[in-house]
A protein has these predicted regions:
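Short beta-strand->loop
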Residues: 84-86, 111-114
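Class I S-adenosyl-L-methionine
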Residues: 32-105
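Mixed-charge interfacial surface used for oligomerization/domain docking
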Residues: 3, 9-32, 92-109, 115-276
Length: 276
């Protein structure tokens, strides 16, 4: 049987993770380290972030953690597909590969999703469905290779400040954004984060998210993402409900991503229909 593993940046709703093993990333406030989703909840994290005590640091799971997980879940005849946050954004894939080599690299495939949050999550859910259906590891990997070219993550942070503090944008850009009340709109596709637009109001940034999702064409899956913006996320889900055929999950993103986005952010994770 093929077992599916991912990391906590995948943001898969808890009721959908039964067939997926999630390895937690680390979050560090000062000298105190937490396992994402285990030692600290999203609510606790965002409450601490709002206090201004300092930007937390994030870190990948260790290779030893992956070694333990692979050794535990992979029986004598089992194989593993381990899907992770884009390698261009994090060292998780590297740690997973080292862990796999310590167990049995021939039976474990490390898959670079080139995405994160529910962009990665949609890939994991597809892999789990295929595994339940009895597809081979090679068949599932082939499907994932095709699918990841159709995955898009769009985000509208409320401010450039947290991107500046995490080193994602320069000080001058962030200060100019604050002075002019600029709201950035960014996209993640095939591991590349790019600035798509900068608008002047929150309502314009939300409208831009909807426009960008609509421009993608027919969607097979769509999730609404947020950081401490439940009401706005619920309204956004209502506004984009016509774009996808299935119920649209509303997900508060992992602290590992929220560290860089900051509070009151909104986003979308979309999978374009394959046409097959």
């Amino acid at each position: 049987m093929v077992k599916i593993v991912t990391d906590s940046t995948a943001d898969i709703p808890p009721d959908l993770t039964a067939d997926i093993t999630v390895v937690p990333c680390f979050i560090q406030f000062g000298t105190t380290s937490f396992l994402d989703g285990m030692d600290i909840t999203r609510e606790q994290f965002y409450a601490r972030l709002a206090t201004g005590e300092g930007l937390p640091k994030t870190a990948s799971p260790s290779a030893g953690m992956f070694e333990q997980v692979y050794g535990r879940i992979a029986g004598a005849r089992d194989e593993v597909i381990s899907l992770h946050v884009a390698s261009a954004l994090s060292g998780v894939c590297t740690a997973a590969r080292v862990g796999a080599q310590a167990v049995d690299a021939e039976r474990i495939t490390i898959f670079d999703s080139e995405s994160t949050t529910m962009g990665l999550g949609w890939l994991c859910l597809a892999a789990a469905r295929c595994a339940r259906a009895g597809l081979s590891r090679a068949q599932i990997i082939a499907l994932l290779d095709r699918m990841k070219t159709r995955v898009h993550v769009l985000a509208a942070p409320d401010t450039l400040e947290f991107l500046r503090r995490s080193g994602r944008v320069g000080w001058a850009s962030a200060m100019m954004g604050q002075l002019l009340h600029i709201k950035p709109v960014i996209g993640l596709y095939r591991g590349l984060v790019r600035s798509i637009d900068r608008v002047r109001t929150r309502s314009h940034s939300i409208r831009r998210l909807i426009e960008l999702a609509t421009e993608l064409g027919t969607l097979e899956s769509l999730a609404v993402l947020h950081t401490t913006a439940r009401e706005a996320a619920a309204e956004l889900a209502h506004q984009v409900a016509h774009l996808a055929p299935q119920p649209i999950p509303v997900v508060e993103v992992t602290p590992v991503i929220g560290t860089h986005v900051g509070p009151n952010g909104l986003g979308l994770a979309a999978v374009v229909a394959s046409g097959e």
